Amino acid sequence: MADETKPTRKGSPPIKVYCLPDERRAIEEKAAAAGMSLSAYLLAVGQGYKITGVVDYEHVRELARINGDLGRLGGLLKLWLTDDPRTARFGDATILALLAKIEEKQDELGKVMMGVVRPRAEP
């Protein structure tokens, strides 16, 4: 039998695409945002695959910070709800301010999450 080997991409002829420098730069930026090489990005797009980007680590860091803030605020609220003696000096105004701060952090968390899920939705 003849020795048949499967063709590889490196052994196949490339497809050349002519584009303007700003078009190339835009494609390179999208490939980098997806965490892919330019070749892999163009191959995936050309075959109709949906490209999913790499999660922005800055967003992840911000989410972790907000989560920590919510945990601390929730702990204070829990102390107050259990009638802990350390919270006896907390008045209604303090508790209402705490609840407002928790709601503010939840809104902030939602905005960051939308930035991760739909990064190109905002101008």
From Swiss-Prot:
MF (Gene Ontology): DNA binding
Main location group: cytoplasm
Compartments reported by the entry: Cytoplasm
Keywords assigned by UniProt, alphabetized: Conjugation, Cytoplasm, DNA-binding, Plasmid
Alphabetical list of Pfam families matching this protein: NikA-like
Gene Ontology terms: cellular component: cytoplasm
Claim: Transferase is one of the keywords in the record: no
Subunit description: Monomer.
Function: Transfer of plasmid RP4 during bacterial conjugation requires the plasmid-encoded TraJ protein, which binds to a 19-base pair invert sequence repetition within the transfer origin. TraJ protein is bound to only one side of the DNA helix. This nucleoprotein structure is the initial complex in the pathway to assemble a functional relaxosome.
Protein name per the record: Protein TraJ
Source organism of this protein record: Escherichia coli
